[in-house]
């Protein structure tokens, strides 16, 4: 029986010693890995899931989105692109898939890739546990254009756009939440995310130097304090963001940013308004915190 061969430059193991497995050589694997997101619908579900999983790894990923793969023919085209990536990069791409069509799914499995099938992972065990066959309907989660929840969501988006940055005081009583904070603290993206993702009517209102001089909330908000939630931000981060918009201005100066942030936080404390710093939080984290703090009568999500 032949002895195991040591890599170049390594000393062979002493006679009688247990051979140790060879360690991977640095550089064997690419710094960036290609990820395909294959879905028979919009791909939002698969993309969200893949983002959560891949965020656990300190590595760069090149994402290729392939929505509306709802026939075997389209699956074959997808396989061609996946295999092309395999031959180019020398490593199997990672594929997240939510295909319902069994023939399309079968075709996709011929790809030279690591395939993570969300339906096979979750739906099949649930079918066994519930003793019930799933509908296997394509895009069922998103086929809601005629539902009440969908209409509420569109209405919420229109409301949030109309009430962005204090543009309108009309119908504020309809708001589920009113976000306040200094300019560029993250109010607009958070409002739109709450509207689009959860169907919440989210208005937002800027706190400006005039408010700080008066030491009071804007008059239009007096009657809606229970609906108000505040956003703050680190002054240094704020000056960086504002300089991208208006470089070298007083508006973006660090001294002014410190003043506005300090005054806004002091006002929110005086008024008993719950608030958080958006500095190191994603829009999703901010929205989740707001949902935990406010009481919403409707359930659109």
Curated annotation (Swiss-Prot):
Binding site for ADP: 181-188
Catalytic reaction equation(s): [pyruvate, water dikinase] + ADP = [pyruvate, water dikinase]-phosphate + AMP + H(+); [pyruvate, water dikinase]-phosphate + phosphate + H(+) = [pyruvate, water dikinase] + diphosphate
EC number from the UniProt entry: 2.7.11.33, 2.7.4.28
Cited InterPro entries: Kinase-pyrophosphorylase (IPR005177), PSRP (IPR026530)
Keyword Membrane: no
GO molecular function terms attached to this record: ADP binding; ATP binding; phosphotransferase activity, phosphate group as acceptor; protein serine/threonine kinase activity
Source taxon at top rank: Bacteria
Ranges of compositional bias, category Low complexity: 1-24
Keyword Kinase: yes
Segments of this protein annotated with the region Disordered: 1-27
Keyword vocabulary terms for this entry: Kinase, Nucleotide-binding, Serine/threonine-protein kinase, Transferase
Role according to the record: Bifunctional serine/threonine kinase and phosphorylase involved in the regulation of the phosphoenolpyruvate synthase (PEPS) by catalyzing its phosphorylation/dephosphorylation.
Family: Belongs to the pyruvate, phosphate/water dikinase regulatory protein family. PSRP subfamily.
Full protein name: Putative phosphoenolpyruvate synthase regulatory protein
